[in-house]
Amino acid sequence: EPDSYVAGIGRMCQRLYAYADARRNPGEAIVALGHLHATGAELSDDDRSERAIMGGLESVSADTFDAGIAYTALGHIHKAQRIGGREAVRYAGSPLPMSFSEKNYRHQVIAVAVEEGKVAGTEAIEIPRVADLMRIPDSPLPPEEVLRCLAGLPEPEVVSEDESRWPYVE
């Protein structure tokens, strides 16, 4: 549909690429940024902030981003991943867990090296977690069992005065 959201995003990306391409100097790279749902992106099972809108009707294909773009950095999906099998179209993922559904994710940023207008390499840089995410218990239990689980937690060796480093407990 010519008036759909996806078609509009496609037209906008084409125009922006043509504008940037016409003005760049030899050897300069074009880097695109987008905060959107891409077709084929893996979503968290139980995180509502990443839900596919209208069953994925507003998902944008990796082909929307011209092959002349050196790197397309996407945001909104919290799990690091490549899109459409293209190394240069990726979600870096969130640098910090945004919900308990991300407790087992590897959180990172992506460093992108560009030479002569092309990606020369990428490096995932893991972000250390400053506060643990603890789900106690891992599955529903009666209140007395939950209290038993909490009582069984080991005492921390050092209690930080900095509350931002205290664990998040669910």
Language-model segments: which ranges?
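Extended recognition/assembly regions associated with phosphoester-bond processing machinery
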Residues: 1-170
